[in-house]
Design a protein with these regions (language model features):
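Short loop/turn motifs at secondary-structure junctions
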Residues: 9-10, 73
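An acidic-aromatic substrate-binding cleft motif
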Residues: 1-4, 9
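Catalytic cores of secreted or luminal carbohydrate-active enzymes
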Residues: 194
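Core alpha-helical transmembrane segments of integral membrane proteins
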Residues: 10-16
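Aromatic- and carboxylate-enriched substrate-binding clefts and catalytic-loop regions
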Residues: 17-188
Length: 194
């Protein structure tokens, strides 16, 4: 369904989020999924498939996982939960960007620190989070409409950002409450769509 929707609406890529692989093993595919078949079908429709993965699993299985995903026809990987910028993590970004480039795959560093110029060396880095994005509504009230109006000017200048827009359960800031299960968005649906 998502591949067909993307093809109908000119959306270049879809993301298959958590659940396609084993919790701690990217080389184990959930038996209820068939990523190679999805990639094959998507390619026929002109849509690329990206997969979500935890950084710790990528770190342990970098070469094997990227070779496997590339062989399936996966076009990119969204890597999550790095949440720091010490020397070991910066080295991880470099190793992953290099391997992804070798495999001709895009990267989305989610749960990342803000950009620092790495895209100049690795144009396959599509985006990175490095921002208080909309998913913060699960645990914080910091992602206000005013914040969302400011970040294109204060954060976006450094490079593309993975903001995760699109909240459709909307309330005004004074009615907002933090909810991890059914997160709300502050403001209006029109604001989210803009």
């Amino acid at each position: 369904y998502m591949v067909d929707y993307a093809a109908r609406h000119g959306i270049e890529y879809i993301l298959i989020d958590e659940g396609w692989s084993g919790k701690d093993d990217l080389l184990y595919m959930n038996p209820e999924t068939d990523i190679p078949a999805v990639c094959s079908y998507a390619e026929k429709k002109g849509v690329g498939v990206c997969l979500w993965a935890k950084w710790i699993n990528i770190d342990r299985q970098l070469d094997e996982a990227f070779e496997m995903m590339s062989g399936w026809g996966v076009k990119g990987v969204k890597i999550d939960f790095m949440d720091r910028n010490d020397a070991r993590m910066v080295d991880f970004y470099e190793r992953v960007a290099q391997k992804a480039a070798e495999c001709r795959m895009l990267l989305d560093f989610h749960g990342s620190y803000p950009p620092e110029g790495m895209r100049a060396r690795y144009p396959n880095i599509m985006t990175r989070e490095g921002v208080v994005g909309l998913e913060y509504n699960k645990w914080s009230d910091r992602c206000t409409p005013v914040h969302q109006l400011i970040i294109p000017y204060l954060r976006q200048w450094a490079g593309p950002m993975d903001f995760t827009p699109g909240a459709m359960l909307n309330v005004q800031p004074e009615q907002f409450s933090i909810n991890n299960v059914e997160p709300m968005g502050q403001g209006t649906r029109c604001h989210q769509l803009a």
